[in-house]
């Protein structure tokens, strides 16, 4: 009998951001495959919360946490197995491994990270590139990683993100009352308080429209331990919503005048697609990854140009924009967790056939 493919479940010990969302949704999509119960096994640290699955069994591995669990305990358990690592890290000595590296930010924008973190991950990525098979989430990241890791672009597979997880979810409209947003006009921005997410430019743009009742709702705005903090201006119209459930995010997006996505550098960018599936217009920074993902379904601005962003916000406030919303829905339909999972599933066979 063929040994099952092990899935690196370290992501279940980490806060939910875009990379962890990718891992969760890809595993759920793999779990829907008819053969998943025999083909895969999810390996998680002993203290991690389990991911509810129907077919794929889960095994817990004790031992030290973090990178040590991955490099020692998981590496030992996986030595006779193929391994799927979905969050940009994995045992560096394991050759029959497919690793999804989401972007080249530690190479291209090391200023956005704490120096030791950026250095460690540049070393890790280079070692993985020598031993493992790589995938990423966009054509842009494929080109970036190929350049910094000295690989041919076609040596790196592309299995994109999606927003299917928000497609049919019932919105929890109680969040509008809880945040005092019922009946108000507001924009949503999703991300953490790090320089890369560039939320300060959205706050500066907010100061330009002469509307004291307009709000900017920051969802998931928190600091991480690996990036440098970006301070927000003190404006009572900025609503710090914190981490929210998917039904709450769906309600916030459905009620918003638009999503503002002002990132300086991304490998993909899930929030614009999440907005599109909820019928929310998108204003995005004009950077390669967002152009690839959003195409003609978003309004764009230079990521440091708060005046241009304010102008795009006024455009949406003067809506409605039914044609743009339909374009957004069609764009979001181009991305599917199931299709991306199928790409990775096939690659796990073809890479070691």
Where are the regions that the model predicts?
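Carbohydrate transferase catalytic cores enriched for Leloir-type hexosyltransferases
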Residues: 1-353
């Amino acid at each position: 009998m063929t040994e099952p493919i092990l899935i690196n479940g370290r992501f279940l010990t980490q806060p939910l951001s875009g990379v962890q969302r990718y891992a969760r949704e890809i595993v759920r999509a793999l779990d829907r495959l008819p053969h998943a119960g025999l083909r895969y096994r999810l390996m998680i640290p002993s203290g991690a919360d389990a991911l509810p699955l129907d077919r794929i069994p889960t095994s817990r591995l004790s031992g030290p946490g973090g990178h040590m669990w991955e490099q020692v305990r998981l590496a030992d358990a996986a030595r006779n197995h193929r391994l799927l690592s979905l969050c940009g890290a994995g045992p560096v000595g394991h050759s029959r491994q497919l690793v999804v590296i989401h972007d080249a930010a530690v190479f291209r924008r090391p200023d956005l990270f704490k120096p030791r973190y950026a250095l460690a991950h540049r070393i890790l990525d280079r070692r993985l590139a020598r031993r493992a098979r790589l995938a990423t989430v966009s054509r842009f990241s494929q080109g970036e990683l190929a350049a910094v890791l000295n690989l041919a672009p076609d040596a790196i597979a592309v299995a994109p993100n999606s927003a299917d997880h928000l497609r049919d979810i019932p919105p929890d409209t109680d969040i509008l009352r809880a945040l005092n947003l019922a009946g108000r006009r507001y924009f949503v921005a999703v991300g953490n308080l790090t320089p890369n997410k560039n939320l300060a430019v959205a706050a500066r743009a907010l100061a330009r429209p002469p509307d004291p009742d307009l709000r900017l709702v920051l969802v998931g705005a928190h600091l991480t331990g690996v990036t440098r903090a970006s301070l927000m201006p003190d404006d009572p119209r900025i609503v710090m919503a914190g981490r929210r459930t998917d039904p709450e995010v769906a309600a916030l997006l459905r009620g918003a005048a638009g999503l503002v996505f002002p990132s300086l550098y991304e490998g993909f960018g899930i929030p614009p697609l999440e907005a599109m599936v909820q019928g929310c217009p998108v204003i995005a920074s004009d950077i390669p990854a967002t152009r690839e993902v959003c195409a003609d379904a978003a309004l764009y601005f230079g990521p440091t140009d708060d005046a241009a962003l304010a102008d795009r916000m006024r455009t949406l406030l003067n809506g409605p924009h039914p044609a743009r919303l339909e374009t957004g829905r069609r764009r979001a339909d181009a991305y599917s967790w199931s299709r991306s999972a199928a790409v990775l599933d096939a690659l796990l066979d073809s890479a070691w056939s």
